Design a protein with these regions (language model features):
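The feature captures the beta-strand-to-loop junction immediately N-terminal to the Walker
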Residues: 12-14
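Conserved ABC ATPase "signature" region
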Residues: 64, 76-93
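H-loop/switch region of ABC-family ATPase nucleotide-binding domains
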Residues: 157-158
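A short, surface-exposed alpha-helical micro-motif characterized by mixed small hydrophobic
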Residues: 163-165
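Conserved ABC ATPase "signature" C-loop
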Residues: 175-176, 191
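ABC ATPase "signature
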Residues: 181-182
Length: 196
């Protein structure tokens, strides 16, 4: 499986088909039993709500912590912190410990940080299915903007509408294997026919 620089690829399949496992392999959270995984470029991911956040830190402290983990200097973080907070729309809650956040608030903070760490590759695993419709739409618009900038994105979702709107290429996984890989319209049509 090769994903080219600048591609926006969606992974689809029923629960348990291997979509999230593939993303975890790409981020090296887990390692393959055989074969190798290579990534070229700086990678950021949104895989599980709350992953990478220190629960006792405030949202603001977590911005600094996460951005530093991704290699941003304190000076770069200082320049971006207001943009991150503004995009997240967390307002005064940014100074509360993240353990007090709802799932939607976690998603707001995680997405806002992820789009501001200068990553070349963005992996997103269904995290955008939480939160309110307004913020989901805002994230979707930002992803379209990142796509136009030539960022590489791999996106897992069960929303076929999102797949059709965002992805150049779709990979249908079934029992850990690629069932179909190609043009989004064709793959989605086959997937919908088969899973009805």
């Amino acid at each position: 499986l090769d994903i080219k620089k600048g591609e926006t690829v969606c992974l689809i399949g029923t629960n348990g088909s291997g979509k999230s496992t593939l993303l975890k392999l790409m981020t090296k959270i887990i390692y393959p039993n055989e074969g190798t995984i290579e990534t070229h470029g700086k990678l950021t991911s949104l895989l599980e709500l709350g992953a990478g956040f220190h629960q006792d830190f405030t949202g603001r402290e977590n911005i600094y912590f996460n951005a530093a983990v991704f290699g941003l200097t304190k000076a770069k973080i200082e320049k971006r912190v207001d943009d991150i907070i503004e995009f997240s729309e967390l307002g005064e809650f940014i100074d509360n410990p993240v353990r007090t956040y709802s799932s939607g608030m976690y998603m707001r903070l995680a997405f806002s940080v992820a789009i501001n760490v200068d990553a070349d590759i963005l992996l997103i695993d269904e995290i955008l299915s939480v939160g309110d419709e307004h913020f989901q739409n805002k994230c979707f618009k930002k992803m379209l903007e990142l796509k136009k900038q030539g960022k590489t994105m791999v996106f897992v979702t069960h929303s076929m509408e999102s797949v059709k709107r965002l992805c150049d290429r779709t990979i249908w996984l079934y029992n850990g294997k690629i069932r179909m890989d190609g043009d989004t319209k064709e793959v989605v049509e086959e997937y919908v026919k088969e899973t009805r």
